[in-house]
Structures are given as C-alpha cells and as structure tokens.
Amino acid sequence: MSQQEPDDSRNCIVAVTLDEESIGRSGPDIEHERAIAIYDLVEKNLFAPQGGGEGPYTLHIGITGNRLMFDIRREDGSPVMVHLLSLTPFRRIVKDYFMICDSYYQAIRTATPDKIEAIDMGRRGIHDEGSRTLQERLAGKVRIDFETARRLFTLISVLHWKG
C-alpha cells in the first residue's frame, strides 16, 4: 500500500490578527508594512499544525516575555493549539536583515545597478536563513513550506521593526 501525500488544500491560514496589547501599534509606515506582510501570508500559504485536524486556520500573534505566541484556531474560532516560539534565535538574523535593508535603501538612491544587485542578493540570503530557522523551530509542531516560512519571517521582522 503506497503512502499518499496529504491533501493540503485546506491547510492554510485565512486570517492573521496581532495582539495589540503585547505588540502595540506603530507609526503609519510600520503599520503599512505589517498589513502588506499579513496580506502576502494569507494570500498563499501552507500551514498544518500537528494533530490539528483539517484547516483552514486563523492565527493570532502576540508576544509574551521573549516568546512569540502563535494562537492557532479553526475558522469558527475553536482552539487548535497555542505555540510559544523563542525569539532569541531570530534576534541576530533580524538585526542583520534590517542592517542590509538599510544599506539597500541607501544604495538604490546612489549606487550602481551591480552594487544594488549584490546588496539585494545578501538581503535575500539573510531572509532565507531566517526562513529556514523558522521552519526548523516549528518542525514537529506546525508544518509549513519554505514560501510560507519566508512570509512568516517577513511578518516577524516587521513586528521587530521600531521604525
């Protein structure tokens, strides 16, 4: 008997909310970046909590101490799981990511196309590192594909952004 691939058509996030008490509101630029990150994540993702049954899911994100809280629920609001994810493994990556993003935004004003491309390749490399770290940290708890990990990492980065 061959093992079938799971049907992931319903294993997805259909809504993301941020806990205003723990994350708080920011200036209009940061709020705009958060909205874009959430839109991109909801638009296309694979999200399958272990033992969570079939989706789709909603994701409420908050910060508790030094941990990112993923409150995962079904579309009807019934709880699936709450997963706390340490932010420590992401601090250096997010810091490096913001430094290279700053360099990129400065370069697009004055640098040559080759220099801009080199900086952008570095930015993508750091983003990929953060995405892989996120996939590793969620392994065995929530199954996500690499593109979903990239979108979630973008959202985590924007949550760290102080402007």
Curated annotation (Swiss-Prot):
InterPro entries: UCP032146 (IPR008321)
HAMAP family tied to this protein: UPF0262
Family under the similarity heading: Belongs to the UPF0262 family.
Protein name: UPF0262 protein RPC_4416
